Amino acid sequence: MLFFNVASLKYKHHESIQMIIDRIDHLVLTVSDISTTIRFYEEVLGFSAVTFKQNRKALIFGAQKINLHQQEMEFEPKASRPTPGSADLCFITSTPINDVVSEILQAGISIVEGPVERTGATGEIMSIYIRDPDGNLIEISQYV
């Protein structure tokens, strides 16, 4: 379902926009099993699970948060097509990437690709790719 006709939009030059977006506050992952997702992110990546209003679950790390929605029980409003396994996320680590590789392999997780050089938001990164229990692509990167 389209909410607007892209061809009919009249974009203004970005310099005319008064609003300033500073950062992403949180994102939402729709998952097939919240408990399995929490266990993976806690045990493999060291995130912490928290419960907030209405018994909602989230993962926190640093100053970031990922809200978790159970598939077919999403909170409103929600994405147009909430689908487990459709995310591609990049997490930055200060741990040397070779140490990350060792920890990931010791946890019994397969590395999809890497270490490989990529370009992050602020410079060059060295990355490895794994998948979470829903098949989301997880990139773990260190700035070089």
UniProtKB/Swiss-Prot annotation:
- Which branch of life, at top level? Bacteria
Gene3D superfamilies in UniProt: 2,3-Dihydroxybiphenyl 1,2-Dioxygenase, domain 1
Induction or repression: Up-regulated following infection of host macrophages.
Domain named VOC: residues: 23-143
- UniProt signal peptide: none
Cited function:
Is critically involved in promoting the replication of S.typhimurium cells inside host macrophages, suggesting a role in the establishment of bacterial colonization within macrophages. May be involved in the biosynthesis and modification of the peptidoglycan layer of the cell wall.
Name this polypeptide is given: Virulence protein STM3117
Where does this protein come from, organism-wise? Salmonella typhimurium (strain LT2 / SGSC1412 / ATCC 700720)
